[in-house]
């Protein structure tokens, strides 16, 4: 009971720390101005060390969040929480490089078995997309000598509360289903004024504000199968998230302000107006091969057709295309049962990912490439501290676009204990 109290207290403290310290500064990327922002990979920090590999490879040690069909591997009660930190350099031809750092809650979750090693349930809270940017640009005044300067800022995103159920149907075949409650709040603001006017000339700010919110449900399915080949296993997995029309509302307002921010004129263009956000379905496949508890190598592929996306009320032009993500990853544990050598019980991971994002800017689809590595440090009996790292870049300097060179750190804590939910016995 004392161990359980420590685990619960530690987990709750980690979750509270995640919300209070990093959630408000979720991301910084000019590309997140598009659509509903940056789409977040759902994999927990442990699999982020392998580039996000997780559609076919289940684990007893961490939350199986990438494919609900693998939940039966979580055979004991589990609490898991993770955060992500990122530092990046943003470059564009003709401008000075800009450095930024940000962080956010990566996930908070619990899972427990309904039938040990056969059927498990999980509850997961994590972001689906993140908006975070603040930048400005100037364009020449038509038939004039001054510039129009526009400041852009935005924050928020879409979040998911996922209820998942997964279990064995036959000895090697498992199925899973998830229902996600999607909710969001996105705020964007565009402020424009004429730069360079004489001091005795009236100058005003034109402020365009938009707020978007949504809440609704969407469904997802998963399947997994494995073949025994000698002492090793060949694992296959697939996921399918259904396309969803998410119910929402939006608010648009146009204001004329003095330079100190006092409103002169305001016009509400839309007030709590009904809107539906069409989120594309997801199809994913995975294959992996390895020896349980020792080593594994695998590959994943996921795609979404963002051409169907509908729901943006942004005043800027937006273009979308099909997104695709390719992942290669591997993990190795020298000796999971070693008593004398702690380093042999550590699980080491490496991976790489190539992501064709859904965003098309100036006729160019924005790509993201990353190299990943990480490890899991075992603590107590069945728990671990998980670390994942990613070095990569997104975008290009060609065609007057923006390139982001980034370094991401994923940290997670997983607490497993088979005494949770066990009724105490008294003599």
Predicted regions and their residues:
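Bacterial Sec-dependent N-terminal signal peptides
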Residues: 1-29, 427
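Subset of outer-membrane beta-barrel
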Residues: 25-427
């Amino acid at each position: 009971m004392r161990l359980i109290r420590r685990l619960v207290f530690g987990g709750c403290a980690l979750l509270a720390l995640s919300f209070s310290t990093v959630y408000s500064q979720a991301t910084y990327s000019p590309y997140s101005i598009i659509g509903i922002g940056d789409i977040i990979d759902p994999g927990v920090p442990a699999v982020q060390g392998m580039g996000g590999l997780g559609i076919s490879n289940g684990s007893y040690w961490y939350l199986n969040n990438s494919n609900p069909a693998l939940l039966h591997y979580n055979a004991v009660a589990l609490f898991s929480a993770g955060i992500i930190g990122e530092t990046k350099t943003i470059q564009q031809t003709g401008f000075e490089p800009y450095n930024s750092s940000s962080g956010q809650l990566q996930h908070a979750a619990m899972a427990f078995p309904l039938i040990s090693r056969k059927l498990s349930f999980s509850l997961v809270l994590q972001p689906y997309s993140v908006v975070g940017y603040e930048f400005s640009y100037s364009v020449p005044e038509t038939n004039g000598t001054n510039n129009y300067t526009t400041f852009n800022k935005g924050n928020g995103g879409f979040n998911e509360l996922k209820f998942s159920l997964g279990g064995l149907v036959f000895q090697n075949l498992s199925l899973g289903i998830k229902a996600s409650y999607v909710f969001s709040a996105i705020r964007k603001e565009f402020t424009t004024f004429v730069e360079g006017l004489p001091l005795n000339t009236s100058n005003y700010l034109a402020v365009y504000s938009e707020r978007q919110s949504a809440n609704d449900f969407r469904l997802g399915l998963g399947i997994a199968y494995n073949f025994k080949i000698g002492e090793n296993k060949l694992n296959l997995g697939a996921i399918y998230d259904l396309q969803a029309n998410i119910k929402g509302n939006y608010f648009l307002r146009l204001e004329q302000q003095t330079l100190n921010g006092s409103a002169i004129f305001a016009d509400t263009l839309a007030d709590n107006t009904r809107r539906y956000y069409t989120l594309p379905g997801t199809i994913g496949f995975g294959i992996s091969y390895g020896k349980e508890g020792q080593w594994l190598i695998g590959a994943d592929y996921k795609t979404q057709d963002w051409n169907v996306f509908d729901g943006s009320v942004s005043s800027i032009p937006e273009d979308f295309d099909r997104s695709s993500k390719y992942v290669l990853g591997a993990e190795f544990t020298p000796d999971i049962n070693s008593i004398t050598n702690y380093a042999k019980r550590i699980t080491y991971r490496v991976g790489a990912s190539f992501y064709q994002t859904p965003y098309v800017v100036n006729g160019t689809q924005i790509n993201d490439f990353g190299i990943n590595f990480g490890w899991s440090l075992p603590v107590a009996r069945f728990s671990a501290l998980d670390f994942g790292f990613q070095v990569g870049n997104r975008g290009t300097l060609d065609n007057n676009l923006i390139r982001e060179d980034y370094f991401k750190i994923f940290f997670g804590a997983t607490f497993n204990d088979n005494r949770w939910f066990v009724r105490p016995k008294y003599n």
